[in-house]
Swiss-Prot record:
Originating gene: Cox14
Name this protein carries in UniProt: Cytochrome c oxidase assembly protein COX14
Pfam families the UniProt entry points to: COX14
Disulphide bridges, residue numbers: none
GO CC annotation terms, alphabetical: mitochondrial outer membrane; mitochondrion
Subunit structure: Along with COA3, core component of the MITRAC (mitochondrial translation regulation assembly intermediate of cytochrome c oxidase complex) complex.
Mitochondrial intermembrane side: 1-14
Length: 57
């Protein structure tokens, strides 16, 4: 039977690991969202340029 200190250590390590995983996952989600935003902005800019050039002709 583990002692109270051992249980506390196990709980602390489990909590720390879960917080670390949540932080990594949050960073991943944030970077994916930023990537999609930049892709969308680039596509809109390109569409605007194409519209300008087709309007000139």
């Amino acid at each position: 039977m583990p002692s109270a200190k051992q249980l506390a250590d196990i709980g602390y390590k489990t909590f720390s690991a879960s917080m670390m995983l949540l932080t990594v996952y949050g960073g991943y989600l944030c970077s994916v969202r930023a990537y999609h935003y930049l892709q969308l902005r680039s596509a809109r800019r390109q569409a605007a340029e194409e519209q300008k050039t087709s309007g000139v002709l």
